Amino acid sequence: VIGGQECARDSHPWQAAVYYYSDIKCGGVLVDPQWVLTAAHCINDSNQVKLGRHNLFEDEDTAQHFLVSQSVPHPDFNMSLLEPHNVLPNEDYSHDLMLLRLNQPAQITDSVQVMPLPTQEVQVGTTCRALGWGSIDPDPAHPVFPDELQCVGLEILPSKNCDDAHIANVTGTMLCAGDLAGGKDTCVGDSGGPLICDGVLQGLTSWGDSPCGVAHSPSLYTKVIEYREWIERTMADNP
């Protein structure tokens, strides 16, 4: 998170940390005691999930640690985009979401809570907050990762603001959010984490420019409400 600040410790009980072995790779959101929603591009063969975390380098008695028993990326996400390649015009990062089934249900506590799925669309002009343990330095070649979860206020912008800024496709299944003045953004390591608007989960951090936080180059977030039925059906079909 660029241009943000440490989140209040007890303000994010649904925030998940998605690990590859011992390295945090992405954020996520607890949407059911046994399911975490994250970005499809966070997929790997050994995801683990930590809940109830705030400072990743402190021993926190609120923490709960899980293995992932099943990873279900959205079937329409183009996995070939994950191979190293030069970005081409009109690449399409749509459907960038994935459900992770925990090896056992989370214990619901003050520090670990389920976030409901959205029931109505967010309006352009709404100020939302993005959360993550991603880089606080905008230069992707030299990321600087914070100990504590960071929060930043970002505005929901017209899709045209993103369309004008990026060569990859901007579609109706994405939210465009940021600060046109620059200096506030999500960044590498924030992927899959939540964009919360008026207390409602509306987006998952998906993709953006490099470096992060450039003026007139807002980032893209998977529009969760577009996938509500898929999320509910996937959880129901894999009890």
Swiss-Prot record:
<dbReference type="GO" id="GO:0004252">
    <property type="term" value="F:serine-type endopeptidase activity"/>
</dbReference>
<keyword id="KW-0325">Glycoprotein</keyword>
<dbReference type="InterPro" id="IPR033116">
    <property type="entry name" value="TRYPSIN_SER"/>
</dbReference>
<comment type="function">
    <text>Glandular kallikreins cleave Met-Lys and Arg-Ser bonds in kininogen to release Lys-bradykinin.</text>
</comment>
<feature type="glycosylation site" description="N-linked (GlcNAc...) asparagine">
    <location>
        <position position="169"/>
    </location>
</feature>
<feature type="disulfide bond">
    <location>
        <begin position="7"/>
        <end position="151"/>
    </location>
</feature>
<keyword id="KW-0645">Protease</keyword>
<protein>
    <recommendedName>
        <fullName>Glandular kallikrein, prostatic</fullName>
        <ecNumber>3.4.21.35</ecNumber>
    </recommendedName>
</protein>
<feature type="glycosylation site" description="N-linked (GlcNAc...) asparagine">
    <location>
        <position position="78"/>
    </location>
</feature>
<dbReference type="GO" id="GO:0031638">
    <property type="term" value="P:zymogen activation"/>
</dbReference>
<dbReference type="GO" id="GO:0003073">
    <property type="term" value="P:regulation of systemic arterial blood pressure"/>
</dbReference>
<comment type="similarity">
    <text>Belongs to the peptidase S1 family. Kallikrein subfamily.</text>
</comment>
<feature type="active site" description="Charge relay system">
    <location>
        <position position="41"/>
    </location>
</feature>
<keyword id="KW-0378">Hydrolase</keyword>
<feature type="domain" description="Peptidase S1">
    <location>
        <begin position="1"/>
        <end position="236"/>
    </location>
</feature>
<dbReference type="InterPro" id="IPR001314">
    <property type="entry name" value="Peptidase_S1A"/>
</dbReference>
<keyword id="KW-1015">Disulfide bond</keyword>
<keyword id="KW-0720">Serine protease</keyword>
<feature type="disulfide bond">
    <location>
        <begin position="26"/>
        <end position="42"/>
    </location>
</feature>
<feature type="disulfide bond">
    <location>
        <begin position="187"/>
        <end position="212"/>
    </location>
</feature>
<dbReference type="Pfam" id="PF00089">
    <property type="entry name" value="Trypsin"/>
</dbReference>
<dbReference type="InterPro" id="IPR001254">
    <property type="entry name" value="Trypsin_dom"/>
</dbReference>
<dbReference type="InterPro" id="IPR009003">
    <property type="entry name" value="Peptidase_S1_PA"/>
</dbReference>
<dbReference type="GO" id="GO:0030141">
    <property type="term" value="C:secretory granule"/>
</dbReference>
<dbReference type="InterPro" id="IPR018114">
    <property type="entry name" value="TRYPSIN_HIS"/>
</dbReference>
<feature type="active site" description="Charge relay system">
    <location>
        <position position="191"/>
    </location>
</feature>
<dbReference type="InterPro" id="IPR043504">
    <property type="entry name" value="Peptidase_S1_PA_chymotrypsin"/>
</dbReference>
<feature type="disulfide bond">
    <location>
        <begin position="128"/>
        <end position="197"/>
    </location>
</feature>
<feature type="disulfide bond">
    <location>
        <begin position="162"/>
        <end position="176"/>
    </location>
</feature>
<feature type="active site" description="Charge relay system">
    <location>
        <position position="96"/>
    </location>
</feature>
